[in-house]
Amino acid sequence: MYSHFKIHIGNELPNTINNYNNNNNSQHNDKMNLSKIKNNQDIPTSNTNISPKPISQQKRRKVEKGGVECKPIVPSTSSTSTLIPTPPPKLPQQQQELQHHSKPSSSSSSSSSSLSSSSTSIPNSPTPIFPVFLIPTQNMDLTCSYSNSQNYVESNINNNINNNINNNNNNNANNIQYINSNTYSGGCISRSSSSSSSSSSSSSGKSNENSIHLNSINNDNNNYYNKVLCYLNQLEDDQRKQYLFQQTQPPQPYPQQIQPPQEQLQQHQSQAPHSPLPQPQPPSQLQTQSIFQISPIPQNNSTQQILIQQTQIHITSTPNQTPISTPQQLGNQQFQFYQASKSTIIEKNNINIQINKNNNSGEFSTNSETNISSSNENINSNNNTKIDNNSNTSNGFNSNSNNNNNNNNNNNSNSVQLNYIEYDGINLNNQIFMNSDFNNEFFPNNTDENYPSDHNSNDNNNDKNNNTNNNIIINDDNNNNPNNNNINNNNSIEIIDEQKHQLQLQELQLQQEQQQEQQQEQLQQCHIEIIKNNSQFPFTPNTTESGFSSTSTTPSSTSVPSSLSNSSSAIPPPSSNYLDCSEPINNLESFNYNNSNTNTNNINNNNNNNNNNNNNNNNNNNNNNNNNNNNIENINIKNSNSNINSGYKSNINCSSPNRTVPNSPISNYSSMSSSSSPNSFTSSTSSLNISCSPNSDPLTPIVPTTPTLIEQTFQIQQPSFENIKNNTQISPSSHDGDTISEVIINHINNNSINNNNNNDKNNDIDNSNENLTTTTTTTTTTTTTTTTNNNKKKINNYKINNYNNNIDNNNHELNDDDNDDDDDDDVDDNDDNNNNNKSIYKKKEIKKREIRDELERKNEPKRRELIKKFIESKDSKFKKLTTDELLIMSPKVFGKISRYNMFEVFFGNEEVCGGNIKVSDTIKYRDQLEQILKKVWSTNEYWRCPLCEDIIISQKSFSQPHENRFSNKSCLKYHLLRLHFADVKSTIVKKRKIESRDMSSDPRYRKCKHDDCHSWITSKHMCDHIIIDHHIDDPQKSKTCGKCNELKKKLKKDFFNNINHYYESNKLSDLKIEYNNNHNNNINTNNNNNNNNNNNNNNNNNNNNNNNNNNNNNNNNNNNNNINNNNTNNNFKTIITTTTTSTTTPSNNIDDDNNKNNNNNNNNNNNNNNNNTNPIPNLPMPKNLQK
């Protein structure tokens, strides 16, 4: 079994390589290369001669279409473990002409837009070096298939303008640019020091192959190096590892020789006894010919500070005299990284990175300020913390970025390059490699739903930096201050002079003091009135001793949560208790951005494809920020898709950030409303109206009342497994519509109880979006905890506990959940002045809890009796219940929590789950079940059985990888069938008359031909209809049923005929399709032939892999651009894609703008656009077309 590595030339994504395979020139070139290799025409005649086996004895393997088949070559006994084979001798003139004929023109040889401009060989080097550097990994899997590289470069000529780079980097012709791999094992990762923006960072996103990008191979040596790589390809795993790098042995002047297998030696001697095998150069030559140019290190010891989100990294460097030229000199054993588990986050670290160039080692150590807290939040959950100056657009739209590479490389030679790779810190070229994910070595199974296994969130989004290279975030000690982050639109970070910066800070502090005085005067007469835009938050809070109340409709005064102010910021807000909506939020860190880098990639993706629009957006952001009173300059919102000032209307209202899906940023600050289901954890925005009241007390602290303002500060509580397992009674919370109390209230006209319950419901703080203790599926709870546990940072945050809003008999205050830990009940204020208040508050809460629990224990028997009375009695009898009895029932109606694991339902036994359930029973008794379900009170989190009052929750397990695979409603059906089967059977249901609707005009529907069946069905529901409605007792009969088979055939044929008729009637004859078995092949072939017309394909792949709120807009817009192409089959495929990707959460306003720009720019880049204005039907397609 051979190990392989895949080689690509150019800067396109690997999954688009085959798009060029149908080009005649590429096939011609590949045939020429294949013939030259087979005929051994241009194999050098020096010591590196390679004598291949006869073709008949070669172990053949499949080669990609248009590729070159690699020949197995036996290694010599004298081969050494060096990386660089000797350069080829000068070839005969005829062979050079042949090679030149098969090459692209000189403009194409300028290679991809991501030439590593500083990765040059030593000027005195006799010939360019071919560095084949592979970082040693375990279980290395290197895939080699040389896939028509000439045409691959040739096809990228129009997209890459690299003349300036090519002129300044003549020695870079043989440089290899390594890229990120998807998995730790087999990762071939490296980068050149201070390398320019690289497109290869996005190359491994879609597939799991480990691919290497060659940035323009020298014309004279191209085929020679192909043979070298083919030679490496034929080695066994251990031999190649020993050949490429001496992993297990210490560095030696001449490493030990490899002993090839005796069997291969005999074959070699019998076939070509006089032809020596290639002998790579000894390591001594490696030390004289530096593969990577080493960036000059400052001659004085300098400590610089780098801001990576909330992590401070100090880099101390010493003068270096010894270049790092080989990976053997700097093995992975010399780097001591902090190895974090998956449940650990490094918060506000000060990490000292010492790079001692004399012994070529680096150490990571954490000082006393390091604060590591255990939580379920990972700053790297989506591998989104990548700061990579190597990335560029794979389509090569930005010629400016390529031209700027020279300037950046010349001017920034002293900068420290910070790259994120997926290996644990091998330093090949004087760079600091820091793993943004603590990656696969620490948790190799990247199967977590929050962590895409293919790293598309970083690698496929044409990452961050377009126009700059080698710039890094160098900040002062106040790294939390957003005013000091000169973050440009292209993520180039300026190095700030320390002394200058101190002067600026002093000036800013003076300005801040003046502003603070002015704003305090304004706020003396103002308070913030919370007005909800959506009934989803129907509470009107007021403060009490515990911070919450249940009666008031308008707060006497409000304040901004302390999370909106940061005492460590250089420019704190004017007051820690107030928010002036005429000013923007000063501190970006007041909101949690740790999980918001995914959409940053979306911004950069749009910017990469919209270079012109990019500049406009940048100017807009700068203008908005320069107009602020706080003098925040050049701040582009790094972790949000919106302009932070876009939603502020002076002194009128200011909207709070949307509460978005976990692992996405607070994506919009504009005053917009978005309707979404509570399960998606997206709420509509709340507007803050500034109203002046001379009687309001501005000094009264108010607990934050709108959860959207402090979205990060919620502590979502997850139910305890022991409680579930032991059937511990857990509160379902006071969703009044979910409890029996509402049932009683609906039948009894008791104003006092109505008021209490209404107030209780009004004070339910975002229960529609919070994960209540008993009402969440495991998936949602896990991801939300990931979002919220971020907020344990030492900032002034209020921590809102998961209150159940239960009405107490004595004081109608909110009480927290039964199963909350005591540590979660206090307010998380970091101020030293609040320590005493925290302890007092904690003691009070503990006392309240004890009193409440004792009361509930006493009332439990009576409550059970009342519930039984409620179930068995009629409505008229409830008038006999007293108010006290109703109050005992209303706040908490317990009942056993039935968490249904569908695996146990279907495959369990009687001891575990009471016996198996037939799936057909849900169909046979569906009318009876629906009749019973009419009496059910339900929420989005759970349903309640009307017969036994059990709380029914669908439990996620290994058999349920998807959140909504089994709903709570379906679990309740199984509950009724298992525990209340007699009641289900005895339920009398009136038969419904099936109303037949004429659907003949709709091409998607077909009428069923079965006897007495008048259903109109689609191909999507055809199988379900046939099996359930006609062959439920014996599903196998549907295969032999003539009417079923006739229906299947007609559905497919009529489906296509009706669609064609629809297109013709709407003058869309270009979209007419034929129904045949080769339809998929036609689509794929035409896509390959028209790849130049589909510049958005890469973007579709990128955006589809970013599981964010805002990706739907990107996908649909890109697909709409593809619809405008001339290709008929491609248009049809685009319709399918649009259909399958049209069900995500609504996008935000700023995304709409960006995507409009994206559409405009991409349409300009498409060569053949048809501006069709006719509507394209959004129709579901058969499964065979959706592949």
From Swiss-Prot:
It comes from the Eukaryota. It comes from Dictyostelium discoideum (Social amoeba). This is Putative uncharacterized protein DDB_G0291812. Residues 38-57, 443-455 have a biased composition (Polar residues). Residues 71-84, 104-124, 190-215, 248-274, 458-490, 543-570, 585-653, 662-689, 752-790, 797-809, 1079-1149, 1156-1174 have a biased composition (Low complexity). Residues 815-832 have a biased composition (Acidic residues). Residues 38-127, 189-215, 248-287, 358-415, 443-490, 536-689, 752-840, 1079-1187 are annotated as: Disordered.
